[in-house]
């Protein structure tokens, strides 16, 4: 399984970005920020590569934005890579 998370330093901003994406009919979710990201407020917005391609530029301009991370889960565990 593979997905993208957008990490912010503010829970409020994470929720606003989530609400924006839902309003744009994008499939997304609020998730706990993985420890491997090493930053953030504890909440991140999870979405697909397609959403990143279409809305990445817009949501990266929100205040307190830390970065995008690729999360891959396999039988061997989870890896987190900063994009």
Q: Where are the language model's segments positioned?
A:
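C-terminal structural segments of small proteins and small subunits
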Residues: 52-83
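Amphipathic, hydrophobic secondary-structure cores in small proteins
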Residues: 2-5, 9, 17-48
């Amino acid at each position: 399984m593979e997905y993208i998370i957008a990490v912010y330093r503010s829970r409020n901003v994470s929720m606003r970005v989530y609400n924006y994406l839902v309003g744009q009919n994008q499939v997304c979710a609020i998730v706990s920020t993985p420890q491997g990201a090493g930053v953030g407020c504890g909440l991140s917005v999870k979405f697909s590569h397609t959403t990143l391609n279409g809305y990445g530029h817009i949501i990266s301009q929100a205040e307190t934005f830390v970065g995008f991370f690729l999360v891959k889960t396999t039988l061997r565990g989870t890896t987190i890579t900063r994009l």
